[in-house]
Amino acid sequence: MQEMKIKLFTIQEVREFVNQVILVDFEVDLIQGRYTIDAKSIMGIFSLDLLSPITVVAHTDDASAFFKKISKFAA
């Protein structure tokens, strides 16, 4: 399990992020406070406070390629 902090400011960024998550073959969660949601859920992402950083949790031992693809969203 590996983690990274991100920020998503626009609807377009949320769509781009979800499109990257859909391509991986492992589970990815988003955590903010006490809420944990599936990173593939656009509606779930919009239920979070997008003004605050969000923790991305990749349930794999090697998420470096995935984190490189989403690095533009790094907080």
Model feature map: region roles:
Residues 11-27, 35-50:
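Amphipathic alpha-helical interaction surfaces in cytosolic regulatory modules
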Residues 1-7:
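Short glycine-/aliphatic-rich beta-strand segments at the starts of folded cytosolic domains
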Residues 4, 26-28, 54:
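Conserved beta-strand core positions
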Residues 47-75:
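C-terminal structural segments of small proteins and small subunits
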